[in-house]
Amino acid sequence: MIPVVALVGRPNVGKSTLFNRLTRTRDALVADYPGLTRDRKYGRAHLSGYEFIVVDTGGIDGTEEGIETHMAEQSMAAIEEADVVLFLTDARAGLTAADQAISEHLRRREKTTFVVANKVDGIDADSACAEFWALGLGEVYQMAAAQGRGVTNMIEYALAPYAEALGLNRDGDDEEEKEEREYTEEEAEAEQTRLQDLPIKLAVIGKPNVGKSTLTNRILGEERVVVYDAPGTTRDSIYIPMERDGREYVLIDTAGVRRRSKVNETVEKFSVIKTLKAVEDCNVVLLIVDAREGIAEQDLGLLGFALNAGRALVIAVNKWDGIDQDIKDRVKSELDRRLGFIDFARIHFISALHGTGVGHLFESVQEAYESATRRVSTSMLTRIMQMAQDDHQPPMVNGRRVKLKYAHAGGYNPPIVVVHGNQVKKLPDSYKRFMMNYYRRSLKVMGTPIQVRFQDGDNPFEGMNTKKLTVSQERRRKRMMTHIKDKK
């Protein structure tokens, strides 16, 4: 399971700066979908070979009363469920009463916590950081998040135990190698067969009170809920094996399956970290949206995370029954306007409470998974690349036309197409989006994002010295140049 790092601290100590530095390397995929913005509170990060989820908890003002009563429930849950807590302090401001109150709260939680003294640039860092040892949370790590100083070392140290325990990849170059890897036809077929035989992991996600629990109960059947109503840990979602129409599934329930008497609770506990971990671990995301509230910013944040993770996607607009036709028309119009950039995702209008439309969800889930694990040959991918190139020539870069040579499969779930050529990494984002959309239309991909990666081909003449002309060849060249000038 991917580890979670929570950033904790009073306001203005640099949590957002560190968050942006850690997550900015993962913005590229979200940028492929105009109209979708990255969530400012949580995101995926990749640094020094580690991949992890980072959460900016916020919500702590440091006062004793604030710790107990005014801290947002989201922040409490994030601290409780995180694997590692980075407790940020301000080295310039020194130790404050707010820092001491937060540290006392963290000590009571017995979390794996690292004290980070931020903003050490331009000051005597050792002297400034000495007083933070009084917090009683162990070693104090120095960092200047705005400049990036000390960030990599901090993450490496904090996540090293999880690398060993979870077998995480520590080789920073492996991701690039994975991108470049070309499947043989036999390997591609074997991988597809393996994926098709596995149960489909389906994560039901959505903001609070959209009906996740109701839908989960409807899918499982009321009589099965009690079976899975066992006390679980607060850190993990519930994994429920099930079968439908002869196909095996694992339903990842982020809300927690409850007894019938508890389903009608007005407030549903929402855990961001549970949701993000479920998205990382699943094959298909089922995003539930409330028809009465329309598309909220939190919906777009969850959607962006799912797309960034490359997950297949089905959208269910819940509570569709009992609303007027003019409201339905308005909701559909808003969906077209705000979700037009993910036209590959099926949208269903359902009532989880009454079961209307729920049965058809699994048709789209299976379609999305099959699209995400579909095998396409190198020859087909190269032919589509050539057709795209004929329809719309790549632009000139440094006075030379970018040339696309061939394409091959680079992975499944999500489908990855690797395009090789000359100077392809210098292609503008607009042309890369054109290629992504061209592949999606040509392959008739439904229910899953498709990733197109570009790999520059090696120049066989690079590094070779050009052969020097002989004296006679030099004279002949000069005579020819003079002759050309005279003709002009």
Swiss-Prot record:
Binding site for GTP 1: 9-16, 56-60, 118-121
A biological process term (GO) from this entry: ribosome biogenesis
Keyword set, alphabetical order: GTP-binding, Nucleotide-binding, Repeat, Ribosome biogenesis
Encoding gene, per UniProt annotation: der
Protein name as it appears in the record: GTPase Der
Span of domain EngA-type G: 3-166, 200-373
CDD domains per record: EngA1, EngA2
Domain of life of the native organism: Bacteria
